[in-house]
Design a protein with these regions (language model features):
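Interaction/scaffold regions that mediate signaling and macromolecular assembly across diverse proteins
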Residues: 1-199
Length: 199
């Protein structure tokens, strides 16, 4: 690849395309966990580990593409807002491919959409809770490192506030200052369908 941006854009696009292919190949399914391997030692094994795809002359599964290639090869938490595992709690799939020349702006936009969507970040003043996507729990260290790289602070909530749109940005900071409890939502593994983003 001529640049790191080219390699990252290619890898994100490959992940999303392979997920779509895997769902289409297994259709009809209700959830990605419905795809089974010969053995199923844990939920999602068939979809994320057992299916192998030929990519760049080698066999790879979705788990390794996400964790070894994307997370291991690039220190950029915005990846979590760009890759989509075809599940209800995933970020929204971009209608456009990620391109090297516009990658930084595309990743910022994906992260802004993710952090500003009430399905992924919701401040509930009635219960004094901040409900976050499980993605922020699973990959908390990635988001904390992203906040530090951006000079935005050191926490997951700092990363969220940094990327959120103007309408949403103040809510997590205000809620944290008020001592609200952070809770992580259960992950919806059902195959994603169009959402009413007011949820």
């Amino acid at each position: 690849f001529p640049t790191e941006a080219s390699r990252l854009a290619y890898s994100i696009n490959a992940y999303n395309a392979l997920v779509l292919f895997a769902v289409k190949r297994a259709w009809p399914i209700r959830a990605v966990h419905d795809v089974r391997g010969l053995l199923e030692p844990k939920a999602g094994f068939g979809f994320f580990w057992a299916q192998l795809f030929r990519l760049d002359g080698r066999w790879i599964n979705l788990y390794d593409l996400e964790h070894d290639v994307l997370r291991g090869g690039f220190e950029d938490a915005r990846i979590h807002a760009a890759i989509v595992c075809a599940s209800g709690s995933c970020p929204t799939l971009s209608a456009e491919a990620y391109l090297p020349d516009t990658l930084d702006a595309q990743l910022d936009a994906a992260m802004r959409d993710f952090t500003s969507n009430p399905r992924h970040v919701r401040v509930d003043d009635a219960t004094e809770r901040i409900a976050l996507s499980a993605i922020y729990d699973w990959f908390g260290e990635d988001f904390e490192a992203e906040a530090r790289r951006r000079g935005a602070g050191e926490s997951v909530l700092d990363a969220i506030a940094h990327f959120a749109d103007e309408r949403t940005r103040a809510s997590p900071r205000r809620a944290r200052a008020a001592g609200y409890t952070v809770v992580y939502r259960d992950y919806d593994w059902s195959v994603n369908l169009p959402h009413d983003d007011g949820a």
